[in-house]
């Protein structure tokens, strides 16, 4: 009789443990799904912010380019204009990465292309902000 109780209690403990493991697995998979959904949301928000930032920079660069194109230019203005044109090309290549990588990277393997595109994204942010700051500073100086 004691043996029956021992077997019954062992069976209850084993089934409780199995349910506990199953619940843990389900909660982990639910957590993974929630984590993945939140990552997708963050990526979506980041993509929207990047798109808005690119649009704003393009608009600002076009406005500055029109300003410099309409009047007489000094050598410094000409240099700023050249930089703005380069920035516009880089921003356009971010919008159409397939075309840009085809044009600029013929003969490279896929890893080199990915590295080049990542470097281009990193290379744009610093100089664009500096260039816009310098151009706006120059405009404010001329106006004031």
From Swiss-Prot:
Taxonomic classification: Eukaryota, Metazoa, Chordata, Craniata, Vertebrata
One GO biological process term: defense response to fungus
Similarity comment: family membership: Belongs to the bombinin family.
Record's keyword terms, sorted: Amidation, Amphibian defense peptide, Antibiotic, Antimicrobial, Cleavage on pair of basic residues, Cytolysis, Fungicide, Hemolysis, Secreted, Signal
Propeptide: 19-43, 74-123
Subcellular localization: Secreted
Organism: Bombina maxima
Main location: secreted
Role description: Maximin-10 shows antimicrobial activity against bacteria and against the fungus C.albicans. It has little hemolytic activity. Maximin-H3 shows antibacterial activity against both Gram-positive and Gram-negative bacteria. It also shows antimicrobial activity against the fungus C.albicans. Shows strong hemolytic activity.
Modified residues (Isoleucine amide): 143
GO cellular component, one term: extracellular region
PTM-bearing positions, type Serine amide: 70
Pfam families in the cross-refs: Bombinin
Protein name: Maximins 10/H3
Summary of the tissues where the protein is detected: Expressed by the skin glands.
Signal peptide: 1-18
